[in-house]
Amino acid sequence: MQPTFTSIREARRWASLFLQQHQREPRVADLLLEHFLKWTPSQLLAFDDQRLPDEAEKDFAQAVRQHAETGIPVQHLTGVGHFYGREFQVNENVLIPRPETEELVLGVMDYVRDENLQTPRIIDLGTGSGVIAITLATELPGSEVSGVDLSEEALEIAEKNAAQHGADVRFYRGNFLESLLEEPFDIIVSNPPYIAFSEKDKMDDTVVDFDPALALFAEEEGLAAYKTILTQISHMKQKPKCIAFEIGHEQGRSVSTLIQEMLPECHTEIRPDINGKDRMVFAFVK
């Protein structure tokens, strides 16, 4: 049965309670209202005594039910994810952008500025929706940024996002660096699949049921993608100056050791995120 509401406030109250009853986050109600009304959070608070337009009411109630009953992410319902203050198109073919990845991007930008690199060549491996590559291209004028992904569907989204933000990024389809070993890059950045298949049963349904498995899981206890990338780097004619990986919070030592074994000329740093969990490994050519 389709609920009806006398005001936006009443719609928020109904949705929050419905979501709580299904063990979902009540704040999803506000995110969906902001999307369907095209309002800011402050507008939602200031005008919550107004009536919800009929079409928005129907779409809102349907989206709340879908999220509550299936776990489908809000970003898939709205088609939008946020990263570094920008909106990006997302769907079931790409990972939803996550705040921890912003810290990886900040680390790369700090390196470029600290080293005073005027025209750095950067490649993002496993680019997905393109948020890393597009953000770096936008925030680092003069940089030459590329993105690679194995998924054609993901690359379609990345291309749309680059066009939306006016970012000059070249996208390639491939298995990480496999077809680009002759190309020189100053920086290689990647948020590869790093979750072990053994962790699947412990994960939230909003992730495991809706994010693409290709972007989540890796063999060898989540380390297979790092090994592939590092093997490819070892075969490059010109090694990068900097390698930046996002990692699982318990993988810091394992990934750092892999780098030191496969690229002994590198110095590695395990870096925590804002919550104090190991989330990044940076490697620099000595």
Ranges and model annotations:
Residues 220-284:
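Conserved Class I SAM-dependent methyltransferase catalytic core
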Residues 32, 71, 101, 132, ...:
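Residue-level signal for inorganic ion chemistry
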Residues 97, 124, 147, 218, ...:
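Conserved SAM-binding loop
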Residues 194-225:
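Mobile active-site "lid"/loop adjacent to the S-adenosyl-L-methionine
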Residues 19, 112, 162, 233, ...:
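Conserved hydrophobic residues forming the short capping helix/wall of the S-adenosyl-L-methionine
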